[in-house]
């Protein structure tokens, strides 16, 4: 080969050392870069190369025959690649090349007179394979926690494909580098969908659950496998390097968070102390200058009988918003005397002034004051009413409960009171009268009575009017005098142990076709489900607080009903498990609950490991009772079985 006359080399070159004007090389600049300076041009160094070709090296012929041969080889490469993908094997350039050479009955590509890069399909496969190999090495090397799911998602995003199979390299789990970095997933069919973020979150949960600093990798992976419902940790497809570093980072982050919260709480406490000290000083100033106070706005709607009295008292003001105890007693006493005088003057009158309130109003939540009683009016009454005015027949009470029980269930207390007053025409057409009634009902003691009544009616909803239970029908041959505590056993002044009496408004009857029954059906399924969910939540929080870091408490029905014969699983560090079934109620007198056949069989199977947690729900707290090993408790007589007759049954009247 020979260079050009000016010492440069031609850019043209034969692909495989063929003859030509040059062998390909670098063309130096012949013009100076800086035009303001004169640079002395030096003569290029000439190199004389052998122009004689190696006759033993076969050179490809790029004529028509060569193109046909390349097309045939390219087609063989594509067919081989498709067959490997269909078989579920990994696709690599080496494997495809060897298979194509075997099909063409050639030992090497040199014997065919071409290179591997000359085949378009093979060249594209080599480029893609090298890119994927480099990406996997860098991705795994740069991350301490890597999952197969993360790796597949990253490769697909980098190559703009939907899944790894679209690359035409076979399954991801069959890739040689995947088997190198994740050797335990060789028998898996698909990677588990778990991200590195989930691994870190589970590591945080693991540290909170067991409260340990020295985390063992195998134990933590077992914890992750159980959380993801995977049969073994080997199938997770998770690679973790330097686990201790992540544990340290999480602990440092929690420590910093605690310090920040401590600073914020300290600032809030200081601010609260400042506000409290200011309020105490204001209260001290108010109490030191206490005078009698009458609110004019609260009596704007009263009748004209008190206008003169309000004018006389208008000169009394106070810096304290509440009356003193002596003034309140004085006002209540004068109001009582005024009403008694009106009662004596209008005994035969139907005027509503009999029950009209004076200027001293009831305040919600006011402190109870003891009112002294004089000797001359010790037996007097504020209201001129008889005991007969407060009597209510059993039928009327039953009608009232059946009328308003749905309203109590659906409406709030304020809307319920409004509907109640409107239904019995107690609201009145006058605005002043409506405001008076609303104010009275929303104040003590009436507001307390309303809430008590609403709670009782709501309780009757869940129990399906528990007063319909007949004592003699609870258990055959069961004496009520020695029975366990139940709603039927609650104190009742109208019954005795010797005579069976139906509770409340149900009368005793010898007609067995209309006898009272214990209702346990799902008439109020929505409310029962809500109570059950609340009871499970309370029991879950109780056991979590009780065991702390000593055991792991799992709520199986937290997101949806599983149908299992238990609601909670308590697993200690030794691997022992306890199964807790929660039974919840809002009734203080309900000491029974339903138990399915599956639950009873499971209780018999687990024995001491099966616990019934009975939760009595209250307004602000709950009472939890545990019963362990139901079968043994039944054998020892501590529990009783209750058999209910079906609602549809064949009955025969027998005369005697």
Swiss-Prot record:
It comes from the Eukaryota. Residues 354-371 have a biased composition (Basic residues). InterPro entries: Auxin_embryo_med, NOV_C. This is Protein NO VEIN-LIKE. Residues 342-353 have a biased composition (Basic and acidic residues). It comes from Arabidopsis thaliana. Pfam families: NOV_C. Residues 283-375 are annotated as: Disordered. Residues 299-308 have a biased composition (Acidic residues).
């Amino acid at each position: 080969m020979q260079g050009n006359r000016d010492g440069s080399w031609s850019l043209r070159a034969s692909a495989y050392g063929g003859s030509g004007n040059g062998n390909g090389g670098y063309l130096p600049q012949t013009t100076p870069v800086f035009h303001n300076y004169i640079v002395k041009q030096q003569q290029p160094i000439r190199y004389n190369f052998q122009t004689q070709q190696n006759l033993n090296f076969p050179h490809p012929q790029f004529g028509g025959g060569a193109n046909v041969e390349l097309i045939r080889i390219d087609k063989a490469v594509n067919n081989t690649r498709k067959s490997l993908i269909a078989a579920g094997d990994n696709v690599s350039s080496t494997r495809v090349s060897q298979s194509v050479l075997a099909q063409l009955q050639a030992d090497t590509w040199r014997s065919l007179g071409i290179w591997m890069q000359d085949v378009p399909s093979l060249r594209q496969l080599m480029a893609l394979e090298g890119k994927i190999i480099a990406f996997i090495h860098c991705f795994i090397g740069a991350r301490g926690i890597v999952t197969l799911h993360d790796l597949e998602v990253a490769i697909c995003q980098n190559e703009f494909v939907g899944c790894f199979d679209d690359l035409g390299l076979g399954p991801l789990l069959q890739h040689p580098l995947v088997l190198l970095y994740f050797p335990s997933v060789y028998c898996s069919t698909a990677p588990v969908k778990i991200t590195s973020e989930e691994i870190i979150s589970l590591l945080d949960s693991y540290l909170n659950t067991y409260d340990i600093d020295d985390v063992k990798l195998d134990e933590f992976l077992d914890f992750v496998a159980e959380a993801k419902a995977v049969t073994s940790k080997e199938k997770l497809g998770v690679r973790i390097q330097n686990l201790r570093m992540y544990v340290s980072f999480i602990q440092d982050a929690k420590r910093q968070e605690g310090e920040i919260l401590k600073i914020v709480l300290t600032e809030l406490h200081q601010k609260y102390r400042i506000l409290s000290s200011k309020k105490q000083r204001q209260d001290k100033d108010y109490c030191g200058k206490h005078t009698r106070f009458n609110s004019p706005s609260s009596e704007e709607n009263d009748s004209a009988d008190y206008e003169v009295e309000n004018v006389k008292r208008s000169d009394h003001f106070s810096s304290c918003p509440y009356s003193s105890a002596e003034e309140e007693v004085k006002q209540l006493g004068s109001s009582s005397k005024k009403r008694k005088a009106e009662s004596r003057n209008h005994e035969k009158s139907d005027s509503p002034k009999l029950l009209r309130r004076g200027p001293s109003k009831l305040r919600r939540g006011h402190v109870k004051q003891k009112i002294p009683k004089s000797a001359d009016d010790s037996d007097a009454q504020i209201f001129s009413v008889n005991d007969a005015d407060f009597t209510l027949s059993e039928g009327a009470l039953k009608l009232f409960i059946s009328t308003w029980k749905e309203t109590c269930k659906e409406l709030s207390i304020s809307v319920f009171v409004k509907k109640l007053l409107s239904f019995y025409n107690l609201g009145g057409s006058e605005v002043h009268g409506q405001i008076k009634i609303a104010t009275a009902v929303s104040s003590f003691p009436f507001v307390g009575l309303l809430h008590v009544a609403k709670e009782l009616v709501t309780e009757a909803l869940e129990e399906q009017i528990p007063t319909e239970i007949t004592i003699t029908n609870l258990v055959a041959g069961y004496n009520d005098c020695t029975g366990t505590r139940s709603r039927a056993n609650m104190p009742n002044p109208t019954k005795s142990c010797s005579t069976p009496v139906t509770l409340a408004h149900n009368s005793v009857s010898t007609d067995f076709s209309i006898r009272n029954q214990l209702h346990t059906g799902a008439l109020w399924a929505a409310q029962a489900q809500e109570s059950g969910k609340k009871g499970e939540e309370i029991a879950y929080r109780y056991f979590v607080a009780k065991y702390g870091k000593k055991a792991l408490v799992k709520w199986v029905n937290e997101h949806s009903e599983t149908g299992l014969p238990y609601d909670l699983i308590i697993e200690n560090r030794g691997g022992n498990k306890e199964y807790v079934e929660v039974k919840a109620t809002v009734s203080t007198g309900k000491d029974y609950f339903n138990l399915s056949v599956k639950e009873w069989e499971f209780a018999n199977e687990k024995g001491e490991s099966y616990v019934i947690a009975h939760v009595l729900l209250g307004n602000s707290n709950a009472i939890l009772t545990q019963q362990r090993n139901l079968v043994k408790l039944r054998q020892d007589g501590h529990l009783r079985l209750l058999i209910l007759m079906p609602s549809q049954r064949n009955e025969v009247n027998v005369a005697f």
